[in-house]
């Protein structure tokens, strides 16, 4: 298993309960596919560097996980499909 950092931006118009459900759903996608979530950070609502789909703000989430490639690929696939996630990125952390 390798260490990854995942950052995704949730559409700002999503209600708080739906937002929590979305975060739990994507955390479940990772854990159900064998990943271990080390740390979760909610950066909250922040201004975007540039407009995405005519939106100027987004709710940022950052996850640090130990995972295999299958869990990361499934997360990536579902994040691309979901309309409430504006952008996401998965970065593999370097071995020290």
Swiss-Prot record:
PROSITE patterns in the cross-refs: RIBOSOMAL_S6
Gene Ontology molecular function terms on file: small ribosomal subunit rRNA binding; structural constituent of ribosome
Pfam family, one: Ribosomal_S6
Keywords: Ribonucleoprotein, Ribosomal protein, RNA-binding, rRNA-binding
Alphabetical list of InterPro entries matching this protein: Ribosomal_bS6, Ribosomal_bS6_CS, Ribosomal_bS6_sf, Ribosomal_S6_plastid/chlpt, Transl_elong_EF1B/ribsomal_bS6
GO cellular component terms listed in the entry, alphabetical order: cytoplasm; ribonucleoprotein complex; ribosome
Domain of life according to the entry: Bacteria
GO terms classed as biological process: translation
Function text: Binds together with bS18 to 16S ribosomal RNA.
Annotated family: Belongs to the bacterial ribosomal protein bS6 family.
Name used for this protein in its record: Small ribosomal subunit protein bS6
Organism from which the protein derives: Bacillus cereus (strain G9842)
Gene of this entry: rpsF
């Amino acid at each position: 298993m390798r260490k990854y950092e995942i950052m995704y931006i949730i559409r700002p118009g999503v209600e708080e309960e739906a937002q929590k459900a979305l975060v739990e759903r994507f955390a479940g996608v990772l854990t159900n596919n064998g990943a271990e979530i080390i740390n979760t950070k909610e950066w909250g609502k922040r201004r975007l560097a540039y407009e995405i789909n005519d939106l100027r703000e987004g709710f940022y989430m950052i996850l640090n996980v130990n995972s295999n490639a299958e869990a990361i690929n499934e997360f990536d696939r579902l994040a691309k499909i979901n309309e409430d996630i504006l952008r996401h990125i998965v970065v593999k952390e370097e071995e020290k």
